Amino acid sequence: VVYTDCTESGQNLCLCEDSNVCGEGNKCILGSNGEKNQCVTGEGTPKPQSHNDGDFEEIPEEYLQ
């Protein structure tokens, strides 16, 4: 399963740096110039993987504990 990167707004659980999930109160920001994505303070929501509205990837249960 492929998980998408995250941007601000909405939910506070998102995938960051491959399989690392940003927890409560954090969001994932995309790295630039070859830098890795980072978890920072703020909420995040998954980006859709396709062009269909609302087509978001789910976060596995094991990450939500």
Swiss-Prot record:
Which terms does the record give in the GO molecular function aspect? Answer: serine-type endopeptidase inhibitor activity
Nucleus found in the keyword field: no
> What's a Pfam family this protein contains?
Hirudin
Name the source's superkingdom: Eukaryota
**Sorted alphabetically, which keywords does the UniProt record give?**
Disulfide bond, Glycoprotein, Protease inhibitor, Secreted, Serine protease inhibitor, Sulfation
Attached carbohydrates are found at: T45
What are the boundaries of the region Disordered? 39-65
| Residue pairs linked by disulfide bridges in the UniProt entry | C6-C14, C16-C28, C22-C39
Subcellular location(s): the record lists: Secreted
Please list the residues that carry the modification Sulfotyrosine.
Answer: Y63
State where composition is biased (Acidic residues).
55-65
Annotated spans, Interaction with thrombin active site: 1-3
Predominant subcellular localization, coarse grouping:
secreted
| Chain positions covered by the region annotation Interaction with fibrinogen-binding exosite of thrombin | 55-65
Keyword Ribosomal protein assigned: no
The name on file for this protein is: Hirudin-3A
Source organism per UniProt: Hirudo medicinalis (Medicinal leech)
